[in-house]
Amino acid sequence: MRISSTFLFNLNLMMKKLISIFVLLCCIASLSANPIHGLLERIDKGASKKFIIQQQKSDVDFFELDQKGDKVVIRGNNYVSIATGLNWYLKYHAGIHLSWNGMTADLPEVLPAVTEKERHETNLPYRYAYNYCTFSYSMAFWDWERWQQEIDWMALHGVNLSLSLTGAETVWKNVLTKLGYSKDEINAFVSGSGFTAWWLMNNLEGWGGPNPDSWYVQQAELQKKIVKRMREYGIHPVL
């Protein structure tokens, strides 16, 4: 069967359109996966329009501050480095302190200019956060909104390796269920959030439970969000 030139022309045109759509979708996915944009918007609505964010390959973790027109340029080898650079700029150039209890700020309409390019780097490959006890002190009853703030705080301070225990209770429940333990036995063994640290360290004899079924589901869903956001930044979760 002969293929007409008109058919080939239309086929070629259709393929070009499909490729263009694919490239556009990839660009959109890339933009939406950039956590710095979301971080800036959470700090101050509209803040992302005041910065230029650039990634640049490097053998060491680094960030640079620069200026292009009326926009501040923050350059780094990964998103954690860039977030650290953002925190440095806000603190030492704009006079804005983002505290552990307050992660929002009113940025000036025109940001203070970076008059001279500035670079900072580190040879330390891992910056670790947290221990078991933290999860039963500060974090025991955090929701996603509070966890989102915490992950932002980690990135702003250069953390790239973090203990991530939320949802471990659900994993234990699922494993014990598959091994044939009853619901009552599991509930007597798995502790609540306020005691998780000591339970996981094997020094808890009992507690006043049990946990509701909805709590296990809630913890699992929360951990999925936590790990997803950590990986978007490039923070490695220690499970």
Give the role of each language-model region.
Residues 35-39, 45, 54-60, 68-239:
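Feature activates predominantly on carbohydrate-active enzymes
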Residues 2-3, 12-18:
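Positively charged n-region of N-terminal signal peptides that target proteins for export
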Residues 7-9:
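Aromatic (phenylalanine/tyrosine) cluster motif
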Residues 11-13, 26, 193:
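Prokaryotic Sec-type signal peptides and long signal-anchor helices
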Residues 18-27:
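Sec-dependent N-terminal signal peptides
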Residues 31-33:
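Boundary at the C-terminal end of the N-terminal hydrophobic targeting segment
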Residues 49-51:
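A short, Trp-centered hydrophobic/proline-enriched beta-strand micro-motif
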